[in-house]
Amino acid sequence: MAAESAPVGVFDSGVGGLSVLREIRARLPAESLLYVADNAHVPYGEKSAEYIRERCERIGDFLLERGAKALVLACNTATAAAAAELRERYPQVPLVAMEPAVKPAAAATRNGRVGVLATTGTLKSARFAALLDRFASDVQVFTQPCPGLVERIEAGDLHGARTRALLERLLGPILEQGCDTLILGCTHYPFVKPLLAELIPADIAVIDTGAAVARQLERVLSTRALLASGQAAAPRFWTSALPEEMERILPILWGSQESVGKLDV
């Protein structure tokens, strides 16, 4: 297989990274895609950095063994915990990682008040603190950890009463602070954008990084002459949890029925 025809490997703690996978498919339709959901260990946001690094190394090895030409770490928490180590582990492999959209949010806010929804792990990370120091010194940032929200999305409950009640409670402090810009600091959260739109004023800008990651992947592949052309192979999916559970959720979050393999690492 020519290097440019090799697939791109994408992984996340669960199904949240499918929001990034959708953006990659839309921008780079010729790329063949591999996706790993580490659902048996979700959410990463409540795990130790060492634990997350070990999981990311195992999954990275798995995807490279299946011919991935590049890796996309489609998880903010995993990026904070493991991106630097993965780049050292795979020095020849392009790695695109996630981080909360602090820079574009700081540029977009009109009143200087920005809210952040993210996992505890992301909000406590040195990487997030560095982003605030670098890009948000002139704005006020109000952070809100979101325990339980990833689990609701993993269950496919994007519009139900329990998810609505949880989001209302999580959004309360941010709305009270008068934020006019909201960062979705977890790849799971774009799936509840329609529900968010019902719960916040229409003039609040909601920012996530999925499209930016797809653009960065395009730049990285182009620089290394690895952009695919022609017909992409069908995407392949694996989960560390029950394949039938992910097969149930894929039509909701990905838009089509797919077969899912079992990840045993």
Curated annotation (Swiss-Prot):
The gene is murI. This is Glutamate racemase. Keywords: Cell shape, Cell wall biogenesis/degradation, Isomerase, Peptidoglycan synthesis. It comes from Pseudomonas paraeruginosa (strain DSM 24068 / PA7). Provides the (R)-glutamate required for cell wall biosynthesis. It comes from the Bacteria. Its EC number is 5.1.1.3. PANTHER family: GLUTAMATE RACEMASE. The active site is at residues 75, 186.
